[in-house]
Amino acid sequence: MLTATDRSTAPVRRVRILTAGGTIAMKGDHAQPELDADGLVASVPGLTAFPDLEAITILNKPSAHLTLDDQLRVCRAARDAARRGIGVVVTHGTDVLEETAMLCDVLHDAEAPIVFTGAIRPASAAGADGPANLVDAVSVAASAPAAGMGVLVVFGGEIHHARCARKTDTTSLVAFSSPQTGPLGRVTEGHPTIWSRIPRNPPLDPPKLDKRVPIIPSTAGDDGTLARAALGASPDGIVLGTLGAGHLAPEVLEIWAQAANDIPVVAYCRPERGVVLNATYGYAGSERDLRGTKIIPAGFLSPQAIRMKLLACISAGLDVDEVRWAFSQDDG
């Protein structure tokens, strides 16, 4: 377990806050983005404990307005600062925070940590959670134990890895969880404790994100209509939802198996926990049949995380075999 045992010790790394909008920057009766980076920092007295703190506004949008270009811009700004040894905190709308954080982890290639946080309640609301989350995030970004961990999500006093974090509650102040792994640590009285780490994956550096990668779920009674419609739109890749532990109706599996000969088709399990099995079931359309095709199992990643990673892989020019290898790093 790694912890800051000497609580009088000053932060080991200077921190840069990059703001991208979201609820944490919203005020007023209708909760519109208002606070820029300077305004956000000025509203949180607890940040005075951190010397040489920088704050830069990258964007000021609600999550639903973000584009892939916006997300890539935020991630590059964070990565560039981390390459200079600066700890980074990104404040971000929570609705798609996990997506941008995952993309950032795919790009991140430095030792300094990048930490995402946000808020459930606007800055002007009673009991606003943004200030505490921001102080906790800066504490983690400034700490020695967080070095080399990649991209983290700090929310509600918990520390999660970007590859595992999901928004699992719309209104709880502990809105994020990691169903597959649980949190990696906690922040208590402003001091981070990290009790587990996840191996980092080799980074990618896509020049832009201009590919089409939809998420296509499966349901009982699926007759392949949605699959055929999705493929008719000429996607560059597919994130495929399977039932249980990698199961599909046989006729639907055949459609996706044919598609996987031409484009990357990456499969996830509908349950929030668990991975595509290897050889437990043997009926038609089971995981044995799926793994006998060129469909790529995604391991423990959520569909949103898979999409961001697959977008980065395809946009960086990886072929299907290289994409398969990239996702094998997360496959149980």
Describe the residue ranges of each PLM region.
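Internal gly/pro-rich beta-alpha loop/helix module
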Residues: 116-188
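Short Gly/Thr/Asp-enriched flexible loops that form oxyanion-binding sites at enzyme active sites
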Residues: 91-112, 248-257
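ATP/nucleoside-binding phosphotransfer catalytic cores, i.e., glycine-rich phosphate-binding loops
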Residues: 250-332
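Short acidic, glycine/serine/threonine-rich loops at helix termini
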Residues: 28-31, 101, 126-129, 161-167, ...
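Short beta-strand segments
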Residues: 18-20, 90-92, 115-118, 150-156, ...
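ATP/NTP phosphate-donor binding region
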Residues: 1-80, 254, 273, 297
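Accessory alpha-helical/coil subdomains and C-terminal extensions
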Residues: 2, 9-14, 18-25, 30, ...
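Short acidic, glycine-rich surface-loop motifs adjacent to enzyme active sites
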Residues: 85-97, 233-244
